[in-house]
Amino acid sequence: MGSEPVIRVEQLFKQYETAAGAVPVLKDVNLTINLGEFVAVMGPSGSGKSTFMNILGCLDTPTSGTYVLNGEDTGTLNADQLAQLRNEVIGFVFQGFNLLPRANLENNVALPLVYRGVKKTVGATQAREMLEKVGLKGYGNSMSNQISGGQQQRAAIARALVNRSRLILADEPTGNLDTTTSREIMNLFTRLNKEDGITIVLVTHEHDIASYAKRLVRFVDGRIVHDGAMTHTEEAHA
């Protein structure tokens, strides 16, 4: 585990304005995640964990409080700077894969590099490298709608890594997968964390999926009610 914080949140508060008035979603949240950690975030529906992940991903902003990502105070950045920081530091993995159905895997994986203006030949090389890393060597020309769900999620992980991201935010990444495939995907996350030092923050409602992480953060009613290491029993999968 690294000692350098990649995520630091202090006194984070988030509320949404509705016709009935302000609705607080996150209340006085404090959290530091260091480089190389593997953290599971859990909580019941409506606990604030999804809003928290959106803020971590620079897809939403807090009402008040501080969020420092990779040494940058996100509250001091404009929208363009925030987008640039997000694209440089974070790789996203979602439950629904979010691959372009009419594009092959190589082009899907290279997409974040296209947004950054990387030359097509360079992007293609990096995409093939990442596909090989996630166990999809030789699949670059395969169409995303012609492969299995597990292979699609592997491709999505390759896309999250292609920017040399230091941090992966994974939102229910096994939600659409069967038990065996879920285990394969979580073993891949474990390998990326152990061998490459990738920081992983994972939202899940499944205890067996959370048990692959080394640290558990639990939300209830917009507050962190538990933050600690997994027990030895829970670590059995890792």
Each PLM stretch: what is its role?
Residues 216-229:
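H-loop (His-switch) and adjacent beta-strand-loop-beta switch element
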Residues 1-15, 226-238:
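ABC-family P-loop ATPase nucleotide-binding domain
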